[in-house]
């Protein structure tokens, strides 16, 4: 199947995008009719509200109602809502919409009994289990604001989030599961609360069979015991709490360019409208079909496309607690797709690079029947053409790259399967979705011609679902996203458009690197390395990695007088990052160098160092202080075996 020969004339995309351009507010008013409102919005968009305007002002709704109740009310309660498939736990079970409603009502009642109400924050620090999804929905049901933190994140990172959003309660579990090991969550949670200035009133702990943990009297409650008690009391069955469309649904923290995380806020109304629209028009999925986002609920993909969008659309969503390889082999994804009749899958290119590495010929696919499988979507990092083409040839279905951010909550650019597929250009996530007016500009905010690389920006206002602000940080939002290019949202990505309007995203313009689809701050890692008593200065940059796309590589300069073995200090630095940021950083390369290359003004030449590490051609920077240092960097990389040529 050659995706490049598709005829764009068969797609309705141009017509739909033009309709949005002609009447953007009418377009989104029509999309909003697919949502159940308690009170319809008074204004589709109010340009005077918020920092760039707000969507569906005056509308009253509830996210949980649209994800669960409406389907039960429509007589579809016996349809599967969630398929839980955990090769790590050796468990599989299905929750119908009716069962999901019951569980969400019960947990909502439990949260109310813990004193949680409308507008209160709740941190969800959990593994990939159904209770994590139920926790998110239960918060939405009672009007509380959830903040999901990736299970197993380091205690210090969790503590900063506790202090920023000040949760009334934390929902967690005794442990998470990784291949060959159990990750204890409770000690991390206890340490985080000890580190944090803010103390939650209560913690609700799910005891998993793999580990039973001790509970702190007066603060911790046993999930199962409290659930059993709540089930006996009929008061747990209650209606959804009405909230404003502009009220926050959740806060999701993403890496900032400093050590302080950014709490991206998602509102209720716009989030539902955009995600519901995307399921049919972008992903081409119908209600009742099985949809699988192979991600984690701790990341934005998990929020939008494991939990909310499939449930808004009345689909069956797969919650997979496993890996693309090693649980048990590189055929794991094919088993899940085959066994559960999955129609559409969404994952990061990293997963397919791992499968390709373990099973380059795709021989394990022959064991499975993927008869219902129609489309594979990739996002979270740049999809390299080799991986995309390999997956397309193996699966014989369209493989669609698309591009978006934690801040937007859904695709900025994609190939809209529901409107008719456009020709694929490997390396491009295709075209702007309705709602996004994408421009490529230079440093002076002047628009650049086709083929010219520049900063990718989006003309304001951003569409529904995009963040209205960062949590209690309007000034920081303006500074981070709006001030540099007045009238535009700064994506902090660089790229270009071609003559057909296709967008090519080439990389980040700030210090955020993308490790296996996870956005991580090199600045944050540098802060940690600099805290080592023997380190004088350091630089962390993302270097190319065949499996993860990018991995961080740290260069450290030791303080004078330090005469300990370099290898010993480097191991301590690796352990320090693991402890302070977590294994998700994938930080394994620390290299001791005598000095770092800098400009005469003292700025570290990270871009040139990255090119050397990646084996790319580079030019001597005109502003360099001492050209000989770059040769020293190259030699240090070769000694460590960390340069691209050695890899």
Language-model features and meaning:
Residues 272-290, 300-343, 357-363:
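Conserved AMP-binding/adenylation subdomain of ANL enzymes
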Residues 431-435, 446-481, 520, 617-618:
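Conserved ATP/PPi-binding loop(s) of AMP-dependent carboxylate-activating enzymes
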Residues 201, 205-207, 579-604, 616-646:
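AMP-binding/adenylate-forming catalytic domain of the ANL superfamily
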Residues 137, 141-226, 349:
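Structural core segment of the AMP-binding/adenylate-forming
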Residues 64-65, 82-137, 154-159, 218-228, ...:
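Conserved AMP-binding/adenylate-forming core of the ANL superfamily
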Residues 315, 343-347, 356-423, 437, ...:
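Gly/Ser/Thr-rich phosphate-binding loop
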Residues 149-174, 189, 338, 345, ...:
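AMP-binding/adenylate-forming catalytic core of the ANL superfamily
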Residues 78-80, 203-206, 210, 216-253, ...:
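Conserved pre-ATP/AMP-binding loop-to-beta segment of ANL
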């Amino acid at each position: 199947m050659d995706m490049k020969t598709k005829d764009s004339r068969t797609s309705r995309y141009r017509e739909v995008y033009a309709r949005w351009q002609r009447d953007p507010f009418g377009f989104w008013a029509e999309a909003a009719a697919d949502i159940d409102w308690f009170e319809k919005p008074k204004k589709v968009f109010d340009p005077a509200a918020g920092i760039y305007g707000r969507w569906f002002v005056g509308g009253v709704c509830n996210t949980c109602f649209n994800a669960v109740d409406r389907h039960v009310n429509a007589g579809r309660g016996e349809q599967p809502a969630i398929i839980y498939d955990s090769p790590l736990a050796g468990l599989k079970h299905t929750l119908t919409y009716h069962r999901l409603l019951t569980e969400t009502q019960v947990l909502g009642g439990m949260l109310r009994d813990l004193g949680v109400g409308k507008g209160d924050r709740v941190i969800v620090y959990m593994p990939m289990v159904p209770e994590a999804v139920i926790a998110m929905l239960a918060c939405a049901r009672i009007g509380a604001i959830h903040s999901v933190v990736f299970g197993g994140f380091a205690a210090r990172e969790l503590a900063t989030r506790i202090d920023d959003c000040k949760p009334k309660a934390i929902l967690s579990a005794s442990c998470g599961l990784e291949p060959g090991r159990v990750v204890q969550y409770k000690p991390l949670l206890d340490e985080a609360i000890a580190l944090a200035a803010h103390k939650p009133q209560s913690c609700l702990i799910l005891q998993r069979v793999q580990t039973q943990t001790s509970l702190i009297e007066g603060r911790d409650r046993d999930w199962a015991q409290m659930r059993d008690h709540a089930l006996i009391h009929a008061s747990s069955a209650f209606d959804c709490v009405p909230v404003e469309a502009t009220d926050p649904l959740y806060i999701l923290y993403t890496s900032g360019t400093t050590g302080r995380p950014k709490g991206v806020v998602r509102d209720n109304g716009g989030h539902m409208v955009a995600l519901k629209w995307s399921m049919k028009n972008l992903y081409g999925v119908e209600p009742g079909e099985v949809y699988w986002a192979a991600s984690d609920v701790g990341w934005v993909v998990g929020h939008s496309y494991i939990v909310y969008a499939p449930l808004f659309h009345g689909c069956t969503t797969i919650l997979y607690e496993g890996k693309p390889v090693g649980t048990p082999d590189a055929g794991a994804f094919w088993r899940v797709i085959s066994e559960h009749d999955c129609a559409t899958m969404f994952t990061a290119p990293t997963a397919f690079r791992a499968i390709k590495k373990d099973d380059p010929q795709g021989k394990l696919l022959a064991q499975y029947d993927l008869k219902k499988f129609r489309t594979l979507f990739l996002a979270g990092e740049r999809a390299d053409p080799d991986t995309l083409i390999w997956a397309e040839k193996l699966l014989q279905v369209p493989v669609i790259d698309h591009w978006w951010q934690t801040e937007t909550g859904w695709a900025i650019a994609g190939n809209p399967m529901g409107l008719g597929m456009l020709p694929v250009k490997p390396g491009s996530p295709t075209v702007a979705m309705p709602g996004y007016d994408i421009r490529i500009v230079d440093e002076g905010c002047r628009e650049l011609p086709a083929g010219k690389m520049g900063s990718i920006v989006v003309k304001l206002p951003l569409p529904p679902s995009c963040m209205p602000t960062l949590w209690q940080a309007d000034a920081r939002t303006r500074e981070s996203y709006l001030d540099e290019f007045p009238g535009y949202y700064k994506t902090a990505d660089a790229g270009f458009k071609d003559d057909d309007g296709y967008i090519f995203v080439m990389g980040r313009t700030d210090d955020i690197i993308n490790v296996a689809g996870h956005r991580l701050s090199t600045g944050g890692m540098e802060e940690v390395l600099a805290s080592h008593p023997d380190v004088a200065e350091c630089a962390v940059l993302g270097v190319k990695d065949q499996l993860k796309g990018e991995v961080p590589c740290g260069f450290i300069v030791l303080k004078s007088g330090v005469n300990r073995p370099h290898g010993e200090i480097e191991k301590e630095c690796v352990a320090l990052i693991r402890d302070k940021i977590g294994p998700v950083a994938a930080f394994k390369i620390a290299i001791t160098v005598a000095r770092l290359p800098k400009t005469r003004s003292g700025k570290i030449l990270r871009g040139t160092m990255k090119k050397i590490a990646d084996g790319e051609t580079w030019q001597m920077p005109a502003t360099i202080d001492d050209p000989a240092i770059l040769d020293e960097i190259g030699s240090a990389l070769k000694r460590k075996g960390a340069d691209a040529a050695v890899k």
